[in-house]
Amino acid sequence: MENILGLMSKDDWIYTGLLLFSFGASCYVRKIGNNILASGALGFAMSLFIIGPKIVYSLGICSIAISIQLLANKKSTPLYVFLTTFTYLMFVRFAHYILPVNEVASHTNVIQLIITLRIIGITFEENDAWVHKSDENPTKRYLTELPTILEKFAYFYHFCGLFTGPYYTYQMLIDSQNPILKSWDPTLEVKSRFVRLLWSVPVFVITNHYFPLDILRSDAIWEVSFFTRLVYAALIFVVFKTRVYSAWAIAESICVILGIGIYPAASNPKIIMGPTDLNAFDKLKTRENIEMSSDAIVNLDIPKVEFSDGFRDGMKAWNRSVQTWLALYVHSRVKVMRVETTMLVSAVWHGTYAGYFMSFGVVAMCAILEDVIFKLVPVDTETGVRPKWFRILYTHTIRCRGFEMLATGFLLKNAYDVHHFWSSIYYWLPLLCIPFYIYSAKISKPKKAQKSE
C-alpha cells in the first residue's frame, strides 16, 4: 500500500479522489435532472469537507461581488468587480502574514481561483447583455436569463470544474438545461477522453516517480552537464503536462455528462463562447438526433501543445478556457501593452510566487521574440508554411526548450529555487528575448507617432 501511495503526492491523491467523486456525482446528477441549485449545493458541501473553515475566503468575495453588482453603476460594475476581486485575492494570499489566519494554499487556493474567474465572468456577461439589450441583430450571443442571487452562488460553487477547471460561462450552464440533452448520449465523448488516460496516467506516474522536481532544487543539478539539465527540464515538463492531460480528461468528461459545452456541431461552437453561427443554432437547438460537439469545453488541443510551430499557438492550445477568459476580459479591453498586461493578470491570478511572474513575464517577451523572428523568416507563398529547416530548428530550440524552462519556473515557484535552476542553464531564454523585446519597442514607437500625427 505504501508503494502505491508513494506514486503520487498527497495533493495529487486528493485531486484524484475529488475528480473521481465528481465524475460519479455528475452521472447521478444527470440521472435525477441536472439541477443547477443542487449541483451548487453539492460543490459547496465538497468544498466545506475539503477545506473546512477556509471556505469563508471564497464566501467573502462572493458576497462582496454580488453586493457591487446590486449597488454599483451598471456601466462601471465590471471594472469595480474586476479590481475588487483581484485586490481581495491578493489580500487573502498575504493575510496570514499579518493576521492569525490560515494561509490560502493548495485546494483552498484552487477554489479561490475558479470562483474568481466565475465572479468576473458572470459580471461581464450581465453587463454585455445590458449594453446590447436593444440590438435587433446581435452578432454574438448574450446572457439569455439574468440569474438570481441564489443562482449566482450555485454557479460560483457548482461542483463541475470547481477543483480543476475548465472555466465555463453562466450562459453555458443555462444551455446545459436544454431538454434535448437529456436524450443525447455522451458515451462516445467520454470514451474518447478516457482513451487519453490509458497513456497519460502511466506516463505521469512513471516520470513523476523517477524524475522528481526536487532535483532542480538540489545542488546535484550543478554536478551534471548543461545538456543533462535541459533533458531533466524536458522530463519535468512531461510530468507537468501528463498530470494536466489526465486531470482535464476527467474534468471535461464531467462537463460533457452534464451537458455543459454541448452544442449542435453545425453552430460552430468555440471554447467558452458557445455557438458562433447563431442562425444554425436557433434552427437546431431544439432538434434531437443531430451531431453534437463539445468544442466549447475542450480545454486542451494536445497536438498543438506538442507540435505547434510557435509560442503563441502553443499557449493558445493550453488551458484554452482560461486563455479565452483572459482574451475576452483583459486583452481585448486594455489599450496599451496588451500582452504584458494579460500575462501580468495571469501571473497574479495564479499566485504570488516569484516563479509565476518570472515565467509569465518571459512569456510576454517570447511572444515579441517570435513576432520579430517570424517577420525575418516569412511564410512561403507557395507552400503556406515557413521553410522546413527553420521550423525544425526553431521548434526544437527556442520553442520546445523555452516552454520547458518556463514550466520549471512555474513549478518551482520560489524565487530562490527558480534562480537556482535558471542560473544553471544561464538564463538563456530571458537573455535571448531581451534584445528582441527592446528592438520591437523601439521600432513600434515611430509607427505610433505617425498614427497620432
Curated annotation (Swiss-Prot):
Similarity annotation: Belongs to the membrane-bound acyltransferase family.
Record-level GO cellular component terms: intracellular membrane-bounded organelle; membrane; mitochondria-associated endoplasmic reticulum membrane contact site
Catalytic activity: 1-octadecanoyl-sn-glycero-3-phospho-(1D-myo-inositol) + (5Z,8Z,11Z,14Z,17Z)-eicosapentaenoyl-CoA = 1-octadecanoyl-2-(5Z,8Z,11Z,14Z,17Z-eicosapentaenoyl)-sn-glycero-3-phospho-(1D-myo-inositol) + CoA; a 1-acyl-sn-glycero-3-phospho-(1D-myo-inositol) + (5Z,8Z,11Z,14Z,17Z)-eicosapentaenoyl-CoA = a 1-acyl-2-(5Z,8Z,11Z,14Z,17Z-eicosapentaenoyl)-sn-glycero-3-phospho-(1D-myo-inositol) + CoA; a 1-acyl-sn-glycero-3-phospho-(1D-myo-inositol) + (5Z,8Z,11Z,14Z)-eicosatetraenoyl-CoA = a 1-acyl-2-(5Z,8Z,11Z,14Z-eicosatetraenoyl)-sn-glycero-3-phospho-(1D-myo-inositol) + CoA
Example GO biological process: phosphatidylinositol biosynthetic process
Native source organism of the sequence: Caenorhabditis elegans
Pathway participation: Lipid metabolism; phospholipid metabolism
GO molecular function: lysophospholipid acyltransferase activity; O-acyltransferase activity
Compartment(s): Membrane
Knockout consequences: Mutants show larval arrest at an early developmental stage and egg-laying defects; 14% of mutants accumulate unlaid eggs that hatched internally.
Membrane topology: Multi-pass membrane protein
PANTHER family: LYSOPHOSPHOLIPID ACYLTRANSFERASE 7, PORCUPINE
Keywords per UniProt: Acyltransferase, Glycoprotein, Lipid biosynthesis, Lipid metabolism, Membrane, Phospholipid biosynthesis, Phospholipid metabolism, Transferase, Transmembrane, Transmembrane helix
Residues with glycosylation annotation: 319
Known EC number: 2.3.1.-
InterPro entries: LPLAT_7/PORCN-like, MBOAT_fam
Primary localisation category: membrane
Protein's name according to its UniProt entry: Membrane-bound acylglycerophosphatidylinositol O-acyltransferase mboa-7
Cited function: Acyltransferase which mediates the conversion of lysophosphatidylinositol (1-acyl-sn-glycero-3-phosphatidylinositol or LPI) into phosphatidylinositol (1,2-diacyl-sn-glycero-3-phosphoinositol or PI) (LPIAT activity). Prefers sn-2-LPI rather than sn-1-LPI as the acyl acceptor. Lysophospholipid acyltransferases (LPLATs) catalyze the reacylation step of the phospholipid remodeling pathway also known as the Lands cycle. Involved in the selective incorporation of arachidonoyl-CoA ((5Z,8Z,11Z,14Z)-eicosatetraenoyl-CoA) and (5Z,8Z,11Z,14Z,17Z)-eicosapentaenoyl-CoA (EPA-CoA) into PI.
Pfam families to which the protein is assigned, alphabetical: MBOAT (PF03062)
